[in-house]
């Protein structure tokens, strides 16, 4: 693995004072260190911004962008406008990630010469219930029509009569993406 590959991590933040510290702690403590951490404060009215500012003072990899509240999608798009990394990951501010999260996905991309790598995840609930959501197609490479038939249709949805055996959660937060592909296709 080339440790010079900068990875941009976009973290939209809005009124998550209860969770954002754990999120930032998990990102700052990644085993892969060459990170460009972009926090987009989407007009938080609680102490989320102060918590983020405190982390930025301790970690020079963190940049904070302040904007008026416009929702999660626009906060992510604002982050995309500031990406410097070869790859980009999105992490929601009420989530935390395993210490090897970025490194494992980057290894997957490098091993397969891929543009995207998806990860499994766990869902944690306030009642201490934990549900494992493993990646369904470990080490599977999708190309050409398989991307449309297996990945996109599974994410977007299809007619009930159309059988899709690959279901990918409809969110960006469990993957690492090529920044070049995002920019080339103006994906926002």
Give the location of each predicted region.
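Short, conserved active-site loop motifs that form the nucleotide-linked donor/cofactor pocket
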Residues: 7, 35, 61-63, 114
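Acidic helix N-cap motif at the loop->helix transition within catalytic regions
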Residues: 21, 35, 46-54, 96, ...
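A conserved acidic beta->alpha catalytic loop
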Residues: 26, 41-50, 68-70
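Short beta-strand/loop segment that forms part of the nucleotide-sugar
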Residues: 35-43, 63-68, 92-93
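Glycine-rich, basic loop-to-helix element that forms the pyrophosphate-binding segment
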Residues: 67-83
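Short aromatic/hydrophobic "clamp" motif used to bind/position activated sugar donors
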Residues: 88
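Donor-binding/catalytic cores of nucleotide-activated saccharide
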Residues: 96-188
């Amino acid at each position: 693995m080339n440790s010079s590959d900068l990875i941009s991590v976009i973290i939209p933040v809005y009124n998550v004072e209860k969770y954002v510290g754990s999120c930032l702690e998990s990102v700052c403590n990644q085993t892969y260190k060459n990170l460009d951490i972009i926090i987009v404060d989407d007009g938080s009215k609680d102490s989320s911004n102060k918590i983020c500012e405190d982390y930025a003072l301790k970690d020079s990899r963190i940049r904070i962008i302040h904007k008026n509240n416009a929702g999660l999608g626009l906060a992510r798009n604002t982050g995309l406008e500031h990406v410097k990394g070869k790859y980009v990951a999105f992490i929601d501010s009420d989530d935390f990630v395993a210490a090897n999260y970025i490194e494992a996905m980057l290894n997957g991309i490098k091993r397969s010469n891929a543009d995207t790598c998806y990860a499994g995840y766990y869902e944690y609930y306030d009642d201490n219930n934990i549900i494992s959501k493993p990646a369904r197609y470990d080490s599977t490479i999708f190309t050409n029509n398989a991307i449309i038939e297996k990945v996109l249709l599974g994410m977007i949805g299809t007619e009930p009569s159309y059988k899709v055996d690959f279901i990918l959660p409809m969110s960006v937060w469990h993957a690492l993406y090529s920044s070049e592909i995002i920019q080339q296709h103006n994906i926002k």
